[in-house]
Amino acid sequence: MKIIFFDIDGTLICGGSELMSESTKEAIRIARANGHICMINTGRTKRLVGENLTGQVEFDGLLLGCGTEIEFHGKQLMHKTFSMEESKAILTAMKKYHVDAVLEGSREDYAPRGEEVFTETFRHMAREIENRKYDRYANAPGNYDKLYAYAETPAGMDGMKRDLSEILDFIDREQGFYEIVPKGYSKATAIRYITDYLKIPMEDTVAIGDSNNDLPMLRYAHTSIAMGNSSKQVLETADYITTDVDKDGIWNALRWLGVLDK
C-alpha cells in the first residue's frame, strides 16, 4: 500500500481552472480502489479548496495551508494558526517594510484596502480582492494560517525576514511573491504528521508536485514525482518526471508508480 500526496495547482488542475481532467479523476479512483491512500497536500487553506474541487473525486484526507491544517476522512487532526501577538507583529512589519499580503485562514481571508495598500501590484488586484469579498486587515482576529505576500523590492521581504525569522518561514514563489507560513510548518511536516498518525512507513510515501512550495514534500517523501510543467528546481529534485498536468500527467505518474495495476 502506498500513501500518495497530491499538490493541487499545476498538479491536479491547471490554467486557473478548478476542474480535474477525467484521466486524473479515474487514476485516483483506481488507486484508491486498489487500496492506496490518496491525499491532497496543498498550500491552499481549507476555504480555498472547497467542495467544488474535492467533490469531483474522493480523497482520503486534506493537508492544507502548507502543513498548518490536517484532516483525515473528514476529521480535523490538527490546526495551527497565528496568535494575536504574532499577528500584530506581522502586520507591524508589513507596514514598516511596505509588504502587501492576503492573510489566508481556514474560514476567512483578509486583504489590504485603500491606504493599507503599499504596492502597485496589489492596487491592480483591487477588483479581484473586491470580487472575492476578502475582509479588511483591521478585522483579522489573528487566527489565520499563512500569508501570500508581495514586495516590490527584495529589501522589503529581507526586512520581514530579519524581524520575523523566529516565527515565520518564507517560501519564494518568484517575481516578488512569497508564501509565508508559521515557523517549522511545511508540506513535509504534514506528511510526517499523517504518516506517524497512520503508522505508515516512509518507504510507502509518494509526493507529486510542480512548484517550489512542493520541494519540502518532494525531498521528504520516499518517492518524488514532478509534473512535466514543473519549475526547474522541482524537475531537478524529482525521482521521476511525468507529463504535463493537461497531458494526462497524473494518470501517467500513477501508472509508472504501479498503483493502477490490479
Residue ranges and their predicted role:
Residues G55-E58, G65-C66, D163-I167, Y220-A221, ...:
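Short, structured coil segments at secondary-structure junctions
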Residues F59-G65, K80, F170-D172, S224-G228, ...:
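Short hydrophobic/aromatic-enriched beta-strand-loop microsegments
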Residues A93, Y97-D100, E104-M217, N229:
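Conserved acidic, metal-coordinating active-site core of Asp-based
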Residues Q56-F59, H79-F82, F118-R123, K187-T189, ...:
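Short, hinge-like loop/turn segments at secondary-structure boundaries
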Residues G35-M39, F59, D145-L147, E203-T205, ...:
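Short active-site oxyanion
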Residues K2-S17:
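Asp-based phosphoryl-transfer active-site loop
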Residues L19, S23-F118:
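Active-site phosphate-binding/coordination module
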Residues M1-I3, S21, E179-K262:
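Mg2+-dependent phosphoryl-transfer enzymes with acidic/Ser/Thr/Gly-rich catalytic loops
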